[in-house]
Amino acid sequence: MLLAALGCTAAYSQAIGDHNYLGQELNTITTAVPFLQVAPDSRSGAMGDMGVATSADVNSQHHNPSKYVFNKNIFGVSISYSPWLRKLVNDINLLYLSAYWKITDYDALSFSLRYFSLGDIQFTDMYGQPMGTQKPNEFAIDLGYSRKLIDQLSIAITPRFIYSNLTAGQIVDNEPTNAGLAGAADVSMFYEQDFALGKSNMNSTLRAGFNISNIGNKISYSSGTLHRDFLPTNLKLGVSYAIDFNEHHTLMAGVEINKLLVPTPPEYLVNDSTGRIEYDAANNPIIKYGKNPDVSVAQGIFQSFNDAPGGAAEEFREVNWSVGLEYSYRNLLFVRAGYFFEHPTKGNRQFITVGAGIHYSIFGLDMAYLFTVDQHHPLENTLRFTLTFDFASFKKDDIRNQGKVQMN
């Protein structure tokens, strides 16, 4: 049976064309539930998906929940919508709801709900006969707690529940399938320091952050199989710098790198005469280069830094990077741009992003637009929209120093 749903979820994380790129073999890392990797909000989406070290906002939950305690307001909520992969089909959608509440000036709680609908999928059997139409979907719910350690540094922990229903209970190889369930967590840190710039006394802010996301159990879609897939455990590192030229004009620039912390597929030994993979006495495929990917989650995280069959050169190709700019006028009007790069042998996502936003009082509306370097890429012309409500509190001054740990 052709599980079209599985193909759709992989499509936005891969763009596989020829078998090699400039003599380098394609070796894309695949995981379950790749929808967790998609930047859902318009602000980040307009800056090359960069967000781990930008200023705090309502949508920090996806990028770096540690930022929430640096929000100037007390409570905020936002909803984001993106029609996804419109170059392929017209009914795949991503919805994202996020919110935060600053308990004190040193503590914050946060929440997000991410829902990914794959639209109508026509299932067929191994002979191509229709087996009905279903609407596969996935969602993730998470709660976060962030805490300032000192005035400039914060940390956060974010547990997550993941539900992935791709097969809608269809029978595959005479075996019933079920929805995949998983639990995961993010661990993050954020640094923010204000200072005067030179003799001009212009205000500026340096920010840095990291986030290790989706640390959790492997996921399976059948109770009768031993095969389980890794979650997209990912490491993000970033830094940004903002300058307030005066009370009206601010410019922020940043750079971010990220890497999947899951095993890289090895290169197996192939028989030259038959073209088939060779197996050992225990009926395991013989690895020619690289390492065995069938390991625990913890081992997979550490192994991911030195298991690529192409050695150090391939490890560096597994690092994606993005750059972004944001200009704001009186924190009212925003213009943004960015660029994201993923090596052609590792998925080939390369795109330019632009966007704009308007924020007035408690309301904010942002949008982002994506241009891909490859005009035939399924991500081409992707749009994102975000509506934000960010509230100051009448009791803001009352909580300003609550929660602070007194140091002797």
Model-flagged regions — what are they?
Residues M1-G7:
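Sec-dependent N-terminal signal peptides
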Residues C8-S13:
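Sec/Tat signal peptide C-region and signal peptidase I cleavage site
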Residues Q14-N408:
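Subset of outer-membrane beta-barrel
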